[in-house]
Amino acid sequence: MRCVPVFIILLLLIPSAPSADAQPKTKDDVPLASYHDNAERTLQRLWNQRHCCPIDLPCCPPG
């Protein structure tokens, strides 16, 4: 009889486990890593532009 509660808990956990097919991907889905990379790249570009020295223009990135 000790196994019954454990068995019931396991049965309850199985349907709630994440599955690879839980949300089918569409062509518009973009991985979060790509958003993170884009945000990081944008912040780096803004940082470089803000710290650009006006006297020595070659230190400024183009754009």
Curated annotation (Swiss-Prot):
Region forming the signal peptide: 1-22
Record note on domains: The cysteine framework is V (CC-CC).
Modified residues (Proline amide): 62
Propeptide: 23-50
InterPro entries hit by this protein: T-conotoxin (IPR031565)
Tissue: Expressed by the venom duct.
Protein name: Conotoxin Vi5.1a
Any Gene Ontology CC annotation: extracellular region
PTM: Contains 2 disulfide bonds that can be either 'C1-C3, C2-C4' or 'C1-C4, C2-C3', since these disulfide connectivities have been observed for conotoxins with cysteine framework V (for examples, see AC P0DQQ7 and AC P81755).
Cellular compartments annotated: Secreted
Keyword Signal: yes
Entry keyword Disulfide bond: yes
Keywords, alphabetical: Amidation, Disulfide bond, Secreted, Signal, Toxin
Pfam families associated with the record: Chi-conotoxin (PF16981)
UniProt record similarity statement: Belongs to the conotoxin T superfamily.
GO molecular function: toxin activity
